[in-house]
Amino acid sequence: MAESILDRTINRFWYNLGEDCLSESQFDLMIRLMEESLDGDQIIDLTSLPSDNLQVEQVMTTTDDSISEESEFLLAIGEISEDESDSGEEPEFEQVRMDRTGGTEIPKEEDGEGPSRYNERKRKTPEDRYFPTQPKTIPGQKQTSMGMLNIDCQINRRTLIDDWAAEIGLIVKTNREDYLDPETILLLMEHKTSGIAKELIRNTRWNRTTGDIIEQVINAMYTMFLGLNYSDNKVAEKIDEQEKAKIRMTKLQLFDICYLEEFTCDYEKNMYKTEMADFPGYINQYLSKIPIIGEKALTRFRHEANGTSIYSLGFAAKIVKEELSKICDLSKKQKKLKKFNKKCCSIGEASVEYGGKKTSKKKYHKRYKKRYKVYKPYKKKKKFRSGKYFKPKEKKGSKRKYCPKGKKDCRCWICNIEGHYANECPNRQSSEKAHILQQAENLGLQPVEEPYEGVQEVFILEYKEEEEETSTEESDDESSTSEDSDSD
């Protein structure tokens, strides 16, 4: 019975997978199973077979009386190829259920695809799984191997060069017997660099006879990558750096005491670029730039600093932090005093004030929202607005009369009567303005309704009464002479 079950299982497994789907390891395993000779009463346990790629789940419910009637096996055989085992993927199992007659039930397929069991749930591969891990490096920062110098597209080039130079110097000094030749030192430096730094060391002709070869390489890197002329004029570059550091310290300002650490770091970095003899003056300048507690900290520094602590910016920063902590403690006490109950003051000594004005604090009552609304049985009358989306009507009112050319609707400027022009006015002879109009017509001028149309010209007409005055004077003289003659 067991032998027939094994034969059917192997045949069904061969039928489901096919020759094209088997790998070499699977093929060898199936051949070994078919070649084994088994007794009739021997029970087969496929899980005991020496194979890492074969997993079997077997369920047997048999009895001695009716072993042929009730026998049911659940065989799940899943095999993984060598390529899949190398990639680390988990094995997938195929379940084959055997009926009482010894046959097997073929897994159902949907639309030419594989068994529906495989489509319902797919196990995630290790590539799809998420394992939260802490980053080993700072995000956005390029990491190089131990002791290697790579300054390609780096911002902090000077720091990287200084650290690398210190490491190279330590290797050479601790192994003097191995690095007596400059060629060996250059070979070490070439293998400890990459990128443009390596190309500089490899393509430059170095002076191997005189001078320190490490110092030559470092000065060349300063010149080529930092723009500092350390190779030709190192002293001038140092002086220039000191002047820039002094200007930087003078311009530094601290407005918010919360940025004390950043301010101290920047000031200290520039201070150590100057001479140590100038440190006390720069420390006093540092303390004077700190708001709120700077004056008190400066007084303490002048009294407490002695010996080498005069040159220590760290000692000054320590005093500043102590004064800052005192202010923080005082602010905490003030917050606690606001919650202090004044009724507790009666516990101490008796009051010494009698009849004074009692100070009372205004009480603020909490406003509660009404639980009900006032019922209004009527609707508020809304204002009717007609023609909300139409053009508004023109307002009625007095309009200034328009006097077009060719019509006599204007008012005469001589008699102020509407219906005629000034040149047709009946009172033009008696009016003094009419004489002016008459003289204008004699000169060939005509009245214009729109004076600002066309070319604009201004004319001035002056009326002189000298002739009339002279005629009156002559008449007076004649009358006076006639009277004199009559008297004679």
From Swiss-Prot:
**PROSITE patterns given for it?**
ZF_CCHC
List UniProt keywords, sorted A-Z: Capsid protein, Host nucleus, Metal-binding, T=7 icosahedral capsid protein, Viral penetration into host nucleus, Virion, Virus entry into host cell, Zinc, Zinc-finger
From start to end residue, where is composition biased (Basic and acidic residues)? 94-109
A biological process term (GO) from this entry: viral penetration into host nucleus
Q: Where in the cell is it found?
A: Virion; Host nucleus
Family assignment?
Answer: Belongs to the caulimoviridae capsid protein family.
Protein name as catalogued: Capsid protein
Q: Which organism is it from?
A: Cauliflower mosaic virus (strain CM-1841) (CaMV)
* Organism lineage string: Viruses, Riboviria, Pararnavirae, Artverviricota, Revtraviricetes
